[in-house]
């Protein structure tokens, strides 16, 4: 079977879901235009924004009024005068991630259990891309659609690493473990701090919801659980912040100086 690369052309027939989406803002749109797996159908611009972005010659664009532009986004969207009408990205699965990981000695994947807020998922995508994760995996049930809000929160990271939606999170964890990954759950009640733990070279960082944390069955599926040591006066961190700290620590242990 031909191995696939998310950021390069592949022989995989794209599986697109849903209708067109509208990405907005200079950085998300610029990265979408650079992503060979993203079909950008049209770019809409305010005349004042024409010098902010380079549009390839093969991509149609047109100047529109502010009212026409903002008809495609929410009222509070920070669009910077730039919107791209796109097809959703092709859907990948756990096997695609494993095939790419087989080429690597070290790898990092994030699994989110019952994290459904698009702003949190977007922020986690941004941290995952910054700290060299290969993918973010979420359950299909209850997952937010790919939207401009999610893309803007991710600051373009949707174009850099895949957001994989799976029907069965437990099965996805089993598949990753069979492929040589260790699943490490972040749990405020864990006995050991992350700083007392040698994280595996191939790690799946499993994050639970901000309110309830890891579900019991998800925690039991993990090979180990760790906690972030914190000031006892602070009950918890936002899930995206906690994830960023954890991903940074894996990078410090395995990629420091590289």
Model-identified regions with their sequence ranges:
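N-terminal positively charged helical leader segments and presequences
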Residues: 1-103
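RNA substrate-binding interface of SAM-dependent RNA methyltransferases
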Residues: 45, 99-192
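Active-site/ligand-binding-proximal alpha/beta "capping" segment
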Residues: 184-238
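Structured adenosyl-cofactor binding patch, chiefly the S-adenosyl-L-methionine
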Residues: 30, 35, 129-130, 151-155, ...
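Short acidic-hydrophobic, aromatic-tinged amphipathic segments that line or gate anion-handling sites
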Residues: 23, 62-66, 162-170, 226
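Short, hinge-like loop/turn segments at secondary-structure boundaries
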Residues: 79-82, 152-157, 200-204
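Active-site helix-initiating loop/hinge in glycosyltransferases
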Residues: 25, 113, 120, 236-238
